[in-house]
UniProtKB/Swiss-Prot annotation:
Coiled coil: none annotated. Pathway: Pyrimidine metabolism; CTP biosynthesis via de novo pathway; UDP from UMP (UMPK route): step 1/1. UMP binds at residues 58, 78, 139-146. GO terms for biological process: 'de novo' CTP biosynthetic process; UDP biosynthetic process. Inhibited by UTP. It comes from the Bacteria. It comes from Nocardia farcinica (strain IFM 10152). This is Uridylate kinase. Catalyzes the reversible phosphorylation of UMP to UDP. Its EC number is 2.7.4.22.
Length: 242
C-alpha cells in the first residue's frame, strides 16, 4: 500500500462507471429512487464546473455471461445486455434533465430516434459546454464488458480518471463481506493490484488503464455525496494509479 498521506488531485473531466445492478436496487428492472439519487449527485458535481461522462452496465436487465451458461449464444446475449444499458442510460438522462442538467446519450449501436451515435469529438464538445454525456450500448460489440467500455471511452475523451462506483467502500485485501478483518487500501499501484490478485475491474479494462496510466478510483456510490467527494480529491475509496 502506498502512503495514505499522498495528496489527491481534484478532477476536471471524469468518466463515471455505474453498475447496472445498482440501478435495479438488487432487483430486475429500475429503482427510480436509486436513479434519482445518482442524478442528484451528478447534478451537484456538474454545478461545480466538472465535466462528467457516464457508462452504465445493464446487469439489472440482462447479463450476457449468465444467459450463455443457460445455452444462449454469447454474442446474442451480449447484444441483449447492450440494450439494457441503453434503457438505463435513457432513465438517467431523464432524471438528470429533471435536475436541470442538459444531457446527451450516445450509443455504440445506431438508434437515431432515441440517442446520438457515439462520436468522440462531439462528446468532447458536449462536455465542454457543461452537458453530461452518457455512453450506452457498451462497445457495440459482443465479448466486451461495460468496464472495458468505461476504460476505452475515458481514454478517448481525455478523462482525468475513471470513477468506479461500487457497493463497497474501496479495494480490500480480502472480501469484507466474508472476512471481518479485511483491510482497505487507500492507494495502490496498477502493478500491485496484479501482483496481489485484487479485483478492481475486468482484465481487459484494467490492462487498458494500466498501459495508458489512467487512474481508477473505486468508491462506494451508496454513501450520498461520494461522487462530489471523489471529484474534489477527498480521500475516499481506493485510488489506483501508476
Amino acid at each position: 500500500m502506498t502512503d495514505p498521506g499522498t495528496d489527491r488531485p481534484g478532477y476536471r473531466r471524469v468518466l463515471l462507471k455505474l453498475g447496472g445492478e445498482m440501478f435495479g436496487g438488487g432487483k430486475v428492472g429500475l429503482d427510480p429512487d436509486v436513479v434519482e439519487t445518482v442524478a442528484e449527485q451528478i447534478a451537484e458535481v456538474v454545478a461545480g464546473g466538472v465535466q462528467v461522462a457516464v457508462v452504465i452496465g445493464g446487469g439489472n436487465f440482462f447479463r450476457g455471461a449468465e444467459l450463455e451458461e443457460r445455452g444462449m449464444e454469447r454474442a446474442r446475449s451480449d447484444y441483449m445486455g447492450m440494450l439494457g444499458t441503453v434503457m438505463n442510460s435513457l432513465a438517467l438522462q431523464d432524471f438528470l434533465q429533471k435536475q436541470g442538467v442538459d444531457t446527451r446519450v450516445q450509443t455504440a449501436i445506431t438508434m437515431g430516434q432515441v440517442a446520438e451515435p457515439y462520436l468522440p469529438l462531439r462528446a468532447k464538445r458536449h462536455l465542454e459546454k457543461g452537458r453530461v454525456v452518457i455512453f450506452g450500448a457498451g462497445m457495440g460489440m459482443p465479448y466486451f464488458s461495460t468496464d472495458t467500455t468505461a476504460a476505452q471511452r475515458a481514454l478517448e475523451i481525455g478523462a482525468d480518471v475513471v470513477l468506479m462506483a461500487k457497493a463497497v467502500d474501496g479495494v480490500f485485501d480480502a472480501d469484507p463481506r466474508v472476512v471481518q478483518t479485511a483491510t482497505m487500501y487507500t492507494e495502490i499501484t496498477h502493478k500491485e493490484v496484479i501482483e496481489r490478485g485484487l479485483k478492481v475491474a475486468d482484465a481487459t479494462a484494467f490492462s487498458l488503464c494500466m498501459d495508458n496510466q489512467m487512474p481508477i478510483l473505486v468508491f462506494n456510490l451508496l454513501t450520498k455525496g461520494n461522487i462530489a467527494r471523489a471529484v474534489a480529491g477527498e480521500k475516499i475509496g481506493t485510488l489506483v494509479r501508476s
